[in-house]
UniProtKB/Swiss-Prot annotation:
UniProt keyword Nucleus present: yes
Coiled-coil region(s): 159-224
Biological function: Probable component of a centromeric complex involved in assembly of kinetochore proteins, mitotic progression and chromosome segregation. May play an important role in chromosome congression and in the recruitment of CENP-O complex (which comprises CENPO, CENPP, CENPQ and CENPU), CENPE and PLK1 to the kinetochores.
Name of this chain's protein: Centromere protein Q
Listed Basic and acidic residues bias regions: 10-19
Pfam family, one: CENP-Q
Amino acid sequence: MKRHRASSGKRGETADGGRVKRPTKSHNQQGPTSQKRGTVGKGDKRAQKRKLVTQAVRREDEEHEDSSSAGEKGHSKKVKLSSAKVESWQPLSESSRKFLESVMDSGILSILCQQSKGKEDVQKHLNLLKERVLRVFKTLKVPLGKLSNLNNVLSFQVAQKQMLEMNETALVQLQEEINEAEKSAERTEETILRLQHDIQVLKSQLEEEEKKARKLCREGDTKELHLPELPKCSLQAPTLQEEILMVKNQKGLLEDMNTIQQSADMRNMLTFIEKIYEKVDLV
């Protein structure tokens, strides 16, 4: 009985060195050969699982090393692809193309918001580039395993729509600022035109004044004064001496004249006349 128990304990060991629980009375009826076959099958499955896991880990490590080395070398490493892998690639989906188009639109709007001059030329150039890229996307084939980052296209589109709305509001504000700047530029241009007209009028007036001044200078050089002619009545009128002789009370007239000459008003007038003569001589 003791030997039988020892041999049954050895039979309970599996191929990978593990132990199996002792069977119950109901399982003992099947016999020792069926127990051995069950333990061997379980060990093979576990070994296969370990092998698959190790292969998957190695594959992931190799892909990580390839991607890291390509990033360090500036994506200069060439990866050889088999024809079977390339044939399994499929064209880019419509949702992915729409998402990429929305990304390009938001990028174009952000560039135009930052641009201060030549916006029309920049916009035309960017739109041409976008059309060329979209044409390439229609025939572009991509691997299926590399599209995991585009699974959440809807959420990305919502975010891009929000960004587009923000860019549109910024464009509206920018357009209002442009309109205000155009109005101020028009007002400035009107002011400039009015000032130019005033300058032309002042120039014409200055030319007329210069002509008059040159004419007076020429007349001053000849030392001839073009004075208006005296009226004939002034030439035919009697002189002051004749009028004085015609006065009967000449003695009283002389006294009045002496009084006038000695008065302060008369002296001031004589001084004024002398100064006028001095200035005329200087001219």
